[in-house]
Amino acid sequence: IWFETFSDLGRILPVAEWIRSMGDVFIMASFSVNVFGYTKTGLSMSELIRTVKGSGLIDGIGFNCGTGPSHLARLLRRQDLGDLIVSAAPNAGYAEQIGNRMFYRDNSGYFCESMREIAELGVNIIGGCCGTNPAYIKMLTQTAGKAPAVKRLTDRPEQRAESEIRYD
């Protein structure tokens, strides 16, 4: 189960505890932080990471939206991620307002190079949020997908994801 784009753990932890009471389920929680590494509710990345590690309820932590890739790389570089599974899905950059619309310039090269830096930090799951599109992700697999694996987490066969598509 993946909780995405949250600003604190207040609503996640009670639900994660309930989910855990039902069985062994992989739980990921992703947060949106600003360029200084804080959520809208004022929690720092290091506080979120420390709480997630200490809770015993959440298997992985992620950061999505809120920042561009180079800011997120800088923030992640300063964190003690330990053995957590970590995801990073920043925005393509920062949107510009033109009239009544928000636009992201095509900066897929910059995005992918910054994401390669993130992958080299040992982040397990990488992707994109606002302003990215399938072309970004395709380029990302070609660029950051070649980054060497920096750290390997202990294999947890009991938590391997299985998927099934059903059309009932």
Where are these regions (language model features)?
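Domain-level signal for soluble alpha/beta catalytic cores
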Residues: 2-168
